[in-house]
Curated annotation (Swiss-Prot):
Biological process (GO), any one: translation
Gene Ontology cellular-component annotations: cytoplasm; small ribosomal subunit
Highest taxon of the lineage: Bacteria
Similarity comment: Belongs to the bacterial ribosomal protein bS16 family.
Source species of the chain: Anaeromyxobacter sp. (strain K)
Name of the protein in its database record: Small ribosomal subunit protein bS16
GO molecular function: structural constituent of ribosome
Gene3D superfamilies, A to Z: 3.30.1320.10
Ribonucleoprotein in keyword set: yes
Length: 88
């Protein structure tokens, strides 16, 4: 079973938001999944990104591969969460 981290669409017509899920690569986009590991809402400004970081790390260590979009979201979240060093 090839596990992937990808987006599952939710919301209404023209107002989507997405769940970040760990699922088998053969399942449909909005089909069954193994675990819900976060939320991504691109309609909010700034974008709403809520991730269960420890569960995402667990799945990545277990061999799950993130989709291109989820990889981009993970990079944005890591960049936003990184502490800013004070200027000397």
């Amino acid at each position: 079973m090839a596990v992937v981290l990808r987006l599952s669409r939710a919301g209404t017509h023209k107002a989507p938001f997405y769940h970040v899920v760990a699922t088998d690569s053969r399942n449909a986009r909005d089909g069954k999944y193994l675990e819900d590991v976060g939320i991504y809402d691109p309609t909010k400004r700034p974008e709403r990104i809520e991730l269960k970081v420890e569960r995402i790390e667990h799945w990545l260590k277990a061999g799950a591969k993130p989709s291109q979009t989820v990889a981009m979201i993970l990079k944005r979240a890591a960049k936003a969460a990184a502490p800013v060093a004070p200027k000397a």
